[in-house]
């Protein structure tokens, strides 16, 4: 299994931020979780609200812990609000079911981490996260 090491996490963050600048969106906070679901690296651009860390972490954590991207969690929340609310309670509020949390999968489709981004619209956050993940040759 491939591991998300510190340099890989930093690369994901930089490419995600570069994508955000290319798109000319609001400043973003990026959180990368490793194969254990632990924070490997995080970085917020200048001008980002400190609260954005919690949102980005909640997106990454929810995706990782539930084994589905936060867009899928968003769809599930629309259909099973009580279930997602209960899971969020179990996660001590660290599950944000809106797009912007993306799983990192290796070449065997195993989950090896996740990326969470907050700062702009959820769709734009997700685009930046995907760019970061794709930059390291993963999906």
Which residue ranges define each predicted feature?
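Flexible, solvent-exposed loop/hinge segments and secondary-structure transition points
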Residues: 1-139
């Amino acid at each position: 299994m491939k591991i998300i090491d510190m340099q890989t996490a930093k690369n994901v963050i930089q490419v995600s931020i570069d994508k955000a600048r290319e798109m000319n969106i609001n400043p973003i906070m990026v959180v990368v979780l490793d194969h254990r679901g632990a924070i490997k690296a995080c970085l917020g651009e200048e001008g980002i609200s400190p609260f954005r860390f919690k949102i980005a972490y909640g997106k990454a954590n929810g995706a990782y812990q539930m084994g589905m991207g936060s867009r899928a969690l968003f769809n599930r929340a629309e259909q099973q609000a009580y279930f997602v609310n209960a899971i969020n309670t179990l996660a001590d509020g660290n599950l944000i079911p809106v797009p912007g949390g993306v799983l990192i999968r290796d070449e065997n489709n195993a989950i090896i981490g996740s990326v969470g981004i907050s700062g702009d619209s959820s769709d734009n956050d997700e685009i930046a996260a995907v760019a970061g993940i794709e930059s390291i040759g993963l999906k």
